[in-house]
Structure formats: C-alpha cells, structure tokens
C-alpha cells in the first residue's frame, strides 16, 4: 500500500510488505500500530494515515472506517484495499457497500503463500478459502440486519 501511495498509480503488481524483524522490531499493541509503522517507514506521511483500531472483523473494519472518514469530513473518491488474495472479494464487497461512490483498487497479497493456483493443494489453503466462504455467509447476514 505504501508503494502504491508513493507512486500514486496502481498497475496491478505490488510485492506486499515483507516481514523484516530488523525494520519492524517494536512491540505493537494492535494491528493498526504495526501497519501504521510499516506505512511510515515506507514513506507515507503520518498525517495521511487514519486510525481505525476498534474492528474485530472485516465488516466492522468497513463500518468503522466509514465513521472515521465521515467524522473527518472526507469524501473518499479512490481507495486502496490491500489484503490477502483469498480475502479480497469479501473485503471489496463490504467497502463497496459502505462507500458506494468510491472507486476501489484491490491489491491482493499472497503473504502466506496461498494463491489462486495452489489453494486447493494443501489443508492450510483449503481451510483459508473455505473459512472465507463461511465468513461471507455469516457476515452477509449481519449486513442484512443493518
């Protein structure tokens, strides 16, 4: 995401954040603190990073992100969604629901080695993808309740 931010273009290729214990050596209390540190160390200005650290699942991420941007009176025209490749469709679905006028660039990352080509070849990949399917059904029902 920081690379895309710096280049201000999306060409469909992004290497993702590689875990580097010599660069990211702090104790992080939340995922947001870690990701903020990654972005700052990769050239994204701190004032350009919005804080949302209350969500416990993806649909809440979208809801709370919307609250943060509304509170800051920001009209989001374009946004980058950077997430695991098998999670990208569900993530996009939620953010499109909460930000219907926004153009999204989805930047999938194969951070855990699970790809479109190999997910069905091992138990870890199968569990990750079928877990996504289960969460789509469960969280979609929550969306309908709202």
Which role fits each region the language model picked out?
Residues 2-121:
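A structural signal for short, hydrophobic/glycine-enriched beta-strand patches
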Residues 113-146:
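C-terminal capping/extension of enzyme domains
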């Amino acid at each position: 995401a920081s690379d895309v931010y710096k280049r201000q273009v999306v060409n469909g290729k992004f290497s993702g954040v590689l875990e580097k214990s010599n660069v990211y050596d702090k104790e992080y209390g939340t995922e947001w603190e870690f990701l903020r540190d990654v972005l700052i160390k990769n050239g994204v200005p701190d004032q350009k990073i919005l804080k949302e650290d209350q969500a416990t699942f993806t649909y809440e991420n979208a809801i709370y992100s919307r609250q943060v941007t509304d509170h800051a009176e920001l009209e989001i025209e374009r946004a980058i969604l950077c997430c695991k490749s098998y999670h990208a469709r569900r993530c996009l679905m939620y953010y499109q629901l909460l930000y219907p006028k926004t153009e999204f660039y989805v930047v999938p990352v194969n951070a855990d080695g699970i790809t479109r080509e190999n997910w069905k070849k091992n138990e870890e990949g199968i569990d990750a993808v079928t877990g996504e399917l289960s969460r789509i059904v469960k969280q979609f029902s929550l969306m309908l309740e709202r």
